[in-house]
Amino acid sequence: MEKRGMRYGFVAMLFSMLIALAAFAPSTAFADVTVNNKTDLQQALDNGGEVTLGDNITGSVTVPSGKTVTLNLNGYTLTADQKYAAITNNGTLTIAGPGTVDGSSLSQTAAIYNAPSGVANLNGGTFTGSKWYVIKNLGTMTIDGASVAQDDAGSSAIDNGYFGNAGNDCGVSEPSFATVSLTIINGSFSGGMNVVKNDDFGVLSITGGTFTNTDGPAVLNWNKATIDGGDFSVNNSASGVIANGSYGANSPDKGELIINAGTFTAPNNGSGNIFAQGQGGTSGGTAVVSGGSYNGSLDNLNNLNVDVEVSGGSFTDAAVAKYVKSGNVAMSANQGNGFQVVSEETAEANAAAKVQNGDSVIYFANIEDAKKFAEDNHIDPSFVEQLHFVITYVDGLTDAAYGSTCTVPAGQKLTKAAIDTPDGEELVPAKEGYTFTGWYLDKELTQKVTFPFEPSSDMELYAGFSKNDPAVNPSQGDNKTTTTTTKTSSAKTGDNLALFGGLLALIAAAGATTAVVAVRRRKSE
């Protein structure tokens, strides 16, 4: 027992010594350091951990493979001094701002190059450049809150994917297969030949952010791109807001564009084109649109080799009706406020009219808008078809509307004066002193409606009434005077005898009473 106790004591002492030694061991793998020059910055990146700029630094640095680094720009600027970038990332890098990373004026030099093995998260900071891409991504990158500004109209602000030659791919040869991922959650992005170019093998996802350009599209997609939000606007010489292109379904440039949401404003505040086609390629690829707001023209799609299919969204151009998916249509809720793409079932149930415009059909919420559209676009009035008729009910005596209407689908009969729909509650007018006589087509109450009734236009139905006769007082009868006569003749003989007999009986009774009183007095005396 004693030996066992000594053995346990020795082990406990050894364990305590190991803990003490560990406490004094250096811990530099995740050191939080502040750096003021290129050498110290590179050393900190080699070690990994949290690194903070303490001054403006000129120098191109690299995050090694296998290292995890959080770089806080701390309001300072890191400027490249050699190609291919101010920061080359082969590891896992998170950048926080404020501060700036500048690709400088060197050719083929970006602010940041994310290599195929790199994972980059740009959560802040401003990234600038003037001679090449501002951001070149061949790995996995997420941008949430950063700003990217391109001063060079000859290059895109962001290039996601392979260009196809080593010079534009930072010395890397394009593989036969790769997945290059860029996710943009939020931020501000501007300038360049394109603001964002989704290149070979690129998979682009945009859920938010502001994208502006003056010389080219906001987004050029060559492979796979999905837009679920964001504000996209271009101006001046831009060919369109969104450009798409493809080299075929089996190539690294599939040209598959999906737009579910977002706001898109064409050049010159909406007078230019929404879509454009990437230069080169074998086709314009496919664009599947299920939502979003589009201020711009679609007329140029006739000349583009882009297969566009629309199942949702709002558009200022009625030409969207040419590109709707089967089962969907374009509908104008209010003339001058654009066209919404809805299901044909929804349009048939809610629209008042539709207009055949060439090979397409456009629905309108009211008949007047449909007629105006036909007139403005030189469409024969016979191509305007009213789908529903509104019946308004009016008091035929006062010309005051009852406030109730009925919407009747074209071709359907009205079996009663229904409210809201033909199956709704029946309106039965009542007026004191009058009897309701039925509904009429005219205010003169000469054309009575016979139900079932099929309306052929919007119309008013007038309630007819007949005035009741004055009420008759039953006590007055027929107003003839009735008189009564009082009898004054003498009573008959039989009546007089009865009266005399009654008097005799009364006298006899009185005499008997007097006699009784007299007897009582004698006894008392």
Could you describe each region identified by the protein language model?
Residues 19-28:
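C-terminal segment of classical bacterial N-terminal signal peptides
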Residues 32-56, 347-383:
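Acidic Gly/Asp/Thr-rich repetitive segments characteristic of extracellular carbohydrate-active
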Residues 38-39, 49-83, 127-130, 382, ...:
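N-terminal extracellular ligand-recognition/capping segment immediately after the signal peptide
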Residues 63-70, 88-103, 113-132, 136-153, ...:
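Surface-exposed loop/turn motifs in large extracellular/passenger domains
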Residues 282-284, 304-308, 331-340, 374-380, ...:
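Extracellular interaction modules
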Residues 355-368, 384-471, 522:
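Secondary-structure capping and domain/repeat boundary segments
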Residues 460-495:
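C-terminal low-complexity, Ser/Thr- and acidic/Pro-rich disordered "stalk" regions positioned immediately N-terminal
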Residues 508-525:
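C-terminal membrane-anchoring or membrane-association module
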